[in-house]
Amino acid sequence: MFANLLNAVKDGVKRKDRFTLDELRRLNDVVARTTAVTTANRDALVETFREIAELMIWGDQNEPTFFDAFVEMRTLTHFSRFINQQARHRAGHRQGQPARGGSHLTLQLLQTLSIMLQNIQLETSLFYLFSNNHVNELIECDFDFDDEEVMAYYISLLKTISLKLNPATVQFFFDYGDGVRGGNKK
C-alpha cells in the first residue's frame, strides 16, 4: 500500500497538472463539506485523503506553498475530526448502535499521516504537524485495537513519529499536567 502511494508521487512529473493548489483546495473542500462518514461516501473520502497525502508530499519536495495552503485550510483539523468521529461511532457500536463507515477511513487516515510524516523534509512543516496537539489527539484516540490492521497502522504511525523526534520536536509531546502541551509553559 505504501509503495503504491510513493510510486504515484514519484510519477508526479508525468501527471504534474494534477499537482496544483486548486486541486488541494478542491480536495480540502470535499473533506470540509462532509459532515459524517457513511457507506455511500466512505470510499470517496478514503481516496480524497490518499490524494491529499500525495499532494502534500509532492508539495513539500517541489512547491512549499502547498504546505501553507494545507495550514490555512486547517486540513489537519479534518483528520482529527474524522478519526474522533470514527471512535465515537465505534463506542456507539459497542453500546448496541450500528457502526457506520467501518475502519477503512481510519486506516487511510493513519496511513496518510504516517506517509506525510515519513516524507516531509522541511522542519517547519514537521513542527506544524506536531504542534497544535493534532498528533497528540490522534495518539490518544480510542482506536479499535481488536482490529489487527488498525493496530498495525497505529504502531506504524508511532514508529514514524519516534523516528522524527529530536530535541526540537520532542517538546510538542510534553504534558505538564495542567493541560499545557508543547513546551508552552511559562
Question: Which functions belong to the PLM regions below?
Answer:
Residues M1-K186:
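Elongated alpha-helical scaffolds that mediate protein-protein interactions in large eukaryotic proteins
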